[in-house]
Design a protein with these regions (language model features):
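Short linear motifs at protein or domain termini
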Residues: 1-107, 114, 232-233
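All-alpha effector-binding/dimerization core of bacterial HTH-type transcriptional repressors
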Residues: 76-152, 194-214
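C-terminal all-alpha effector/ligand-binding and dimerization domain
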Residues: 129-137, 167-234
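Short loop-to-helix capping motifs
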Residues: 34, 161-163, 206-207
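Flexible, glycine- and charge-enriched loops at secondary-structure boundaries
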Residues: 3, 7-10, 121, 142, ...
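Hydrophobic/aromatic residues within well-ordered alpha-helical segments
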Residues: 9, 13, 104-108, 124, ...
Length: 234
């Protein structure tokens, strides 16, 4: 039976290496050999192998006999994994990742808003209103306003009544944090209350078309902002 200490050490190494992989430390150099890693971290081979297994389960690395361990391309990473998502948030600014996150939101959130208008789950809709009211109340506090904005959008996923949307909460939550934080910085202000209220009002009225369009409007504006900053960097 593996000791709790061994598992704890392996997890700590996995976190350190995983963060280094996702933030690009090994983009220009190969992934270290097992011996190099053991020397660097002062860990046993058993513990290091366990850490690498954890990284492999997240899609970050792959190991082949006589070829060693290599970092996998981003498309093979498990982007639904909470650790991978957290590390992605620590990457240097990347137009591509912000654009892709916002595109994903555009594919999901307007449909969720339309479904919420159709389902009419009163408790879930009340949670959306709570999110909007929190956005208004925290308008002068950037961090609190950001969290309220996230809560608003996540509440819409719940109100959709679609369990698959709700299961995407960890991914959507991080996508929201990344994209909203960026667009707030670009625009110079926190989220527009009126545009968010338009989504809520449409949902409360049961107007699925208006709810979908209001959600799309916010996200398309976010895409424009991201494309603008990308153009300025080129």
């Amino acid at each position: 039976m593996r000791s709790e200490l061994g598992v704890s050490l392996a997890y700590g190494l996995m976190r350190s290496l995983g963060q280094s992989i996702v933030t690009g430390e090994f983009e220009t150099v190969g992934f270290p050999t097992e011996a190099e890693l053991c020397t660097k971290f002062g860990a046993s081979r058993t513990v290091m192998r366990e850490a690498v297994k954890m990284l492999s389960a997240k899609g970050l690395v792959s190991s082949r006999q006589r070829q060693g361990t290599r970092v996998e391309p981003v498309e093979n990473w498990n982007l639904l994994d909470p650790d991978v998502l957290r590390w992605l948030m620590e990457r240097p600014f990347s137009n591509k990742i912000f654009l892709e996150f916002t595109q994903m939101r555009l594919a999901i959130e307007p449909t969720a808003a339309a479904l919420a208008a159709q389902v009419q789950d009163k408790l879930a809709i009340a949670a959306i209103r709570e999110g909007l009211e929190a956005m208004i109340a925290t308008a002068g506090d950037q961090d609190a306003a950001l969290q309220a904005d996230i809560d608003f959008h996540v509440a819409i996923l719940k109100a959709s009544g679609n369990p698959f949307f709700w299961r995407l909460k960890p991914l959507i939550n991080n996508a929201l944090r990344l994209s909203i934080e960026l667009t707030n910085k670009i625009s110079g202000h926190t989220a527009d209350i009126a545009s968010h209220e338009a989504i809520l009002v449409a949902i409360e009225k049961g107007d699925a078309v208006a709810a979908e369009q209001a959600s799309e409007s916010i996200l398309k504006e976010s895409l424009k902002l991201i494309e603008t900053i990308a153009a300025l960097k080129n």
